[in-house]
């Protein structure tokens, strides 16, 4: 069985809300693990994640431990970065055994080719502000400047502020992505 989750935004909200969200997510991972061949985490698992060479965000102990436990048990965990956790480095792969993808991928699942993407940077050609922000935030130069000029405490404070601003700006509680044209639409759309 294949399981998919996205936009959990671990760490968002107040401390009590963030802990409740994490506990629910870990319970979901436990449930999925009963018969999972693979678990696909399709972006924005974390509300903000930035890795320094030797520093990762504080918290998420239950989630990180659970991901490591799942991969230790032979369950494939595939992590796609989203617009809130695009600065994931190698920590999750190295310490938790998670596969990391920073761009859309195609997988063969149950005999079908399945295209998987977070979608934050899809179909933004006609939206110059989003295209600009996407380019800026994915810039290696900005990542380097961020990591060398900002103390981790300040970087996390800024990241959580920006993330909350971004998350709240849309006003949506659910998303349906339907802009695929008939000639682009695969047989099965997940």
Predicted regions located by residue number:
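Short, flexible active-site-adjacent loop segments at beta-strand->alpha-helix junctions, enriched
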Residues: 83, 104, 113, 118-121, ...
């Amino acid at each position: 069985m294949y399981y998919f989750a996205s936009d959990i935004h671990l760490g968002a909200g107040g401390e009590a809300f963030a802990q409740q969200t994490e506990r629910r997510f870990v319970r979901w991972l436990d449930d999925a693990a009963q018969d999972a061949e693979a678990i696909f985490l399709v972006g924005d698992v974390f509300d903000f994640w930035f890795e320094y060479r030797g520093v990762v965000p504080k918290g998420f102990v239950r989630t990180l431990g659970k991901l490591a436990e799942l991969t230790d048990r032979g369950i494939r965990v595939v992590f796609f970065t989203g617009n809130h956790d695009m600065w994931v480095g190698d920590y999750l792969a190295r310490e938790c055994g998670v596969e990391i993808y920073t761009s859309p991928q195609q997988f063969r699942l149950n005999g079908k080719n399945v295209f998987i993407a977070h979608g934050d940077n899809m179909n933004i050609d006609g939206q110059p502000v989003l295209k600009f922000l996407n380019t800026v935030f994915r810039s290696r130069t900005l990542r380097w400047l961020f990591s060398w000029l900002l103390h981790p405490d300040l970087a996390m404070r800024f990241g959580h502020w920006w993330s909350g601003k971004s998350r709240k700006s849309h006003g949506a509680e659910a998303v349906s992505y339907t802009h695929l044209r008939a000639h682009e639409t695969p047989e099965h759309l997940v």
